[in-house]
Amino acid sequence: MKRIFKGLGGLALLIIGYLSFWPVAIDPVAWNAPEDKGYVGAFAANTQLANLERLSIGDIHGPEDVVMHEGKIYVTSQDGKILEIDPKLNTHREYADTKGSALGMEVDSAGNLIIADAFKGLLSVSPQGVVSVLTDKVDGTPIAYADDLDIAKDGIIYFSDASTKFGAESIGTTLSASLLEIMEHRGTGRLLAYDPRNQTTRIVKDGYVFSNGVAMAGDGDILMNETGTYQVHKISPDGTSRIIMDNLPGFPDNINRGPKLEDGRESFLIGIISQRSKWLDDNSSKPSARKVAMRLPASLRPQSVSYGLIVQIDVEGNVIKTWQDPSGDYPNATGAIIADDGYMYVSSLTAPDLGRMKLE
């Protein structure tokens, strides 16, 4: 019996030692997460995003971003394939393959699809489907996690590099890399600018905890989501920045330009990919607890909780409207566009199809 107790004691010491000292990939810092107010006020729960119609994307998954161009819908995907969808017939074809992990996408003035590819950098896809790299480095450092982009009136492409420490390709998946950046919270993300006139890339501003969705405002500033802090920033091309939304009820992902409001104001659509994690918020000031969590099996770590939420805001961050699905039936919605055909198309990190709903 004594031997059994000694054996159990030794095992307990091994487990304690493992949870306390085993090396992990992150070196977390303390911060203070704001109190999660939940779905109240402007975010009061509704079911207006429920029962989305689904458009087939074949055997790929994760239609991360969506654009409409000349009546056709284009979506990116986790495995690098770009699909062209006929929204009237619900048919699709492979338009291009980046051989990476295609995330954000916009159309430039020449009809090229500009892609933020987490593995490859900033790419251009010609109308013939030819893929070329615009940039994959800045100031001698690799662009490790190109995430989202928008194009200014002068043609400059502003795009996010979500993490310079946890590259999507080096870590293995976009999701795994994003979780490491958020758990560590040192803020290695940045906003970059690529000028196609002289093929130069520069850092606009850095220090973000997973810099994510990017959208151009009419005054030339850039709206950018910072996923790890539940914030939206308004950043000028010279790097001057201010927070226009704080303490969102979930993790903001993509942001896209929306239709003008009745009074002429600009609007933008933000996708909230997951509810906030109470455990992460409660342990925001406890780096050691987050280190211990990283030593646990992945199934025991904080998990994303799907809750469908698209938020429409004005350029100052005031909430205009929300579309919600508390059931999260369409999983991990990353964002949305309101297209010329009267539909709102909803993208996703993990769904096997593209969601849409007819707007009244």
Residues covered by each model-derived region:
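Sequence-structural signature of mature extracellular/luminal beta-sheet repeat domains
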Residues: K2-E360
